[in-house]
Structure formats: structure tokens, C-alpha cells
Amino acid sequence: MSKGIHFEQSITELEEIVRQLEKGELSLEESLKQFEKGISLARRCQNALNQAEQKIETLTGTDSNIELDSDEQTSD
């Protein structure tokens, strides 16, 4: 569960960095610092998502193609 918390914290922090950069009020040096931090956070989040996807694929025994039971497939 702590990985989920870290993911959520990273997303929140990344959103804040984007807001700061979009305002355009930071100095060039501070903007570069925040951009670098944002890239690091984005990579960390992407890695967490990739790991979650792999775990789901392992648990379902598929590669993102989950088959529905015959009862779930009927739309009538």
C-alpha cells in the first residue's frame, strides 16, 4: 500500500510543478530545477504504472486481454 501512497504523492507533486512552470514566474534556474524534478517524478510514476500493469498481467494470466465469462458477454 505504501507504493500507492508514494505514487499519489508523486502525482500531486508533479501537478504542482506543472502549475508553477505554467505560471512562468520562476527564474530560469529555478524553472530548470523544477523541470528536472518533474522529469524524475514522471519517470518514477511511469515505472510504478508499468509494474502495476505487469502484476495485473501476471495475476490474470493475460497480456491485457481479459476474457469475459459467457454470461458477461451477452448484451441482450
UniProtKB/Swiss-Prot annotation:
Organism classification: Bacteria, Pseudomonadati, Pseudomonadota, Gammaproteobacteria, Legionellales
Main location class: cytoplasm
Pfam families named in the record: Exonuc_VII_S
One GO cellular component term noted in the UniProt record for this chain: cytosol
Keywords, ordered alphabetically: Cytoplasm, Exonuclease, Hydrolase, Nuclease
Reactions the enzyme catalyzes: Exonucleolytic cleavage in either 5'- to 3'- or 3'- to 5'-direction to yield nucleoside 5'-phosphates
GO molecular function list: exodeoxyribonuclease VII activity
The keyword Nuclease appears for this protein: yes
Family affiliation: Belongs to the XseB family.
Protein name per Swiss-Prot or TrEMBL: Exodeoxyribonuclease 7 small subunit
Function summary: Bidirectionally degrades single-stranded DNA into large acid-insoluble oligonucleotides, which are then degraded further into small acid-soluble oligonucleotides.
Keyword Hydrolase: yes
PANTHER family documented for this protein: EXODEOXYRIBONUCLEASE 7 SMALL SUBUNIT
Entry EC number(s): 3.1.11.6
Subunit-structure text: Heterooligomer composed of large and small subunits.
GO biological process: DNA catabolic process
Location(s), subcellular: Cytoplasm
